[in-house]
Amino acid sequence: LMQNIQKNAGKLSCSFHKIIKMKKKYTDSCRLFVLKSNRKENQEKMFEVGEYIVYGCKGVCQVEEITHIDIPGSNKDRLYYVLAPLEDRNGKIYAPTDNAKVAMRKVITRQEAEQLIEEMPQIEELWVANEKQRELQYKEALKTCDFRAWISIIKTLYFRKKERIAQGKKITSLDERYLKAAENELYGELSLILGLPKSQMEDFICRKLEA
């Protein structure tokens, strides 16, 4: 997304630039990253086999099984979700069903996705007061599994990239890494919900904002 914006600097071909024109700032607290819908309930209720969920920074996963696992030193009575990441179907994640350390939620609905796309211009930047804490705040924002957090990171890093280019500098490797991570999370979930290839998500968002 940001690469496309940079290529078209000065003559953006789609209205997605409205998202990044509004240079606002969040406070340092990641507590502000909360979906309007009641996502807190997701970790209070069991997910079901076959459901798609977002698990931490691992992106969208499908619940393949809910079972006990026999691992030395573990509580054999503890239940685990066996998760299959969409981007790595051969991979497996064993997540305790009562795990409060890693954010888990159901994927958003199509209606919620369309609403969030419409709200993108109003989503604020991530305000980083202490440069030494920048990477930590990026990590914490990504780990919230919050759609708005991903968009906030993208907007923040776009402006940083723009400022560095104006100074004759390149984007830092740290910023580049988290920009790609946020875009991957954003497009990955939208792709599943809207039934479109990830590569088409940017154009889809543009069309929605132009409508």
Located regions from the model:
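Short, solvent-exposed secondary-structure boundary/capping segments
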Residues: I69-Y80
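Charge/polar-rich, low-complexity and marginally structured segments
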Residues: T97-A211
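Short beta-strand-centered aromatic/proline hotspots
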Residues: G59-I69
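A short macromolecule-binding patch
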Residues: V82, D88-T97
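Loop/turn positions that initiate beta-strands
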Residues: G50-E51
